[in-house]
C-alpha cells in the first residue's frame, strides 16, 4: 500500500445523502443532512439536542495548508499521512477535558470514525479567537518592525522574541471577509480590537453584547486547561486559535459553544519545553512546516506578502515538495497526538472505504 493511498486528500466526494451543496474548506468538508436523516439520527442515537436540530457530517482530510494555500508532495502525495486522524483525536481529547472542567460544550455529537464527526449546525461567531502567551510569529514581526499596538493592546518596550508575554493576550482577527464594519478592512484574517467587536457585535454574529465577555472567558479558560495539561507532558502552549458559535439545546435555549478544532498543531504553536529551556525552539505544530517552506523557496516574501497571493498560489500549485518534508510533519502530528491522548494513532490503508462502510451500515446515510 503506497503512502498516497493512505492519505485522504479529497473529502468532498463521498456518497453521503445530502440535499445541499457540500461545503469544502481548507481541511474539512461538511455534508448537511436532510431533515429526515437528522431527526432519525437524533432519535436513534439519543443525541441531546432538539428533535428538529439540523445535523451535518464533518469529514477531515489529510491535506496540508500553510500561508492560505494547499501543498502537495512528490509521487502523487496529496497530503500528510495520519494528519487528519491526529487532529481529530487531539480535538476530541480537549473537548472532553473542557467538559470535565465544566466549560462549554462543542458542536460534536458523535464520532463514527477517526476522520468523521457528526455535528450540530451552529451559527458561527465571525472571529478567529486568538490567544497568545508568548511573543512570536506575526506579533513578533510587527513588534520587531516598531509597532507597539497590536489588536488595540499597548505592548511595552523590551519584549524579546519567543519569550513569555507579561500576561495572556487575546488578539482577535476576522473570520472571512466582513463588509461594512467601520474601521475593519474588507480582507480575510484582519486583526481587530476588542472595541471593534463591542461597537459592532451583531456584525460579528454575537447574539448580544454580553456574550463578548463570555467568549473571552471561554477562550482564557480553554487556553489554561490545555496549557496545564501540556505542561504535564513537557510541552509549552505558546498560542492558539479557537472558534465559537451558537446552538440550541434540547429545550430550545441558545448557548455559546466551542466549535471547529481546539489545541491542535494546525491551530496552535506547541513547543517542546525541555528544548525551550535549553534555548532551542522545537515545534510540535504546523509552524515547523511553515518554516520549511520559508527556507525551501528562494523568495520567502511570496509566502508572507498578501499582495503576492497569485504568485503564492502558483508556487503551491506548480511545486511538488520532497516526500520527506511531508513525512516530517506526519511524525510531528502523530507524535504530539499520541503524547496528548496517550493512545496510538493508527493509519488506515483506505480511509474513504472505511468511512463509507460505517456511515452506511451504522448510520444509514449512504445512497
Swiss-Prot record:
Pfam family, one: SAICAR_synt
EC number: 6.3.2.6
Catalytic activity field: 5-amino-1-(5-phospho-D-ribosyl)imidazole-4-carboxylate + L-aspartate + ATP = (2S)-2-[5-amino-1-(5-phospho-beta-D-ribosyl)imidazole-4-carboxamido]succinate + ADP + phosphate + 2 H(+)
Top-level taxon in the UniProt lineage: Bacteria
Pathway: Purine metabolism; IMP biosynthesis via de novo pathway; 5-amino-1-(5-phospho-D-ribosyl)imidazole-4-carboxamide from 5-amino-1-(5-phospho-D-ribosyl)imidazole-4-carboxylate: step 1/2
Keywords: ATP-binding, Ligase, Nucleotide-binding, Purine biosynthesis
Gene Ontology BP term (one): 'de novo' IMP biosynthetic process
Record family assignment: Belongs to the SAICAR synthetase family.
Name by which UniProt lists this protein: Phosphoribosylaminoimidazole-succinocarboxamide synthase
Native source species: Vibrio campbellii (strain ATCC BAA-1116)
UniProt lineage: Bacteria, Pseudomonadati, Pseudomonadota, Gammaproteobacteria, Vibrionales
Gene name for this UniProt entry: purC
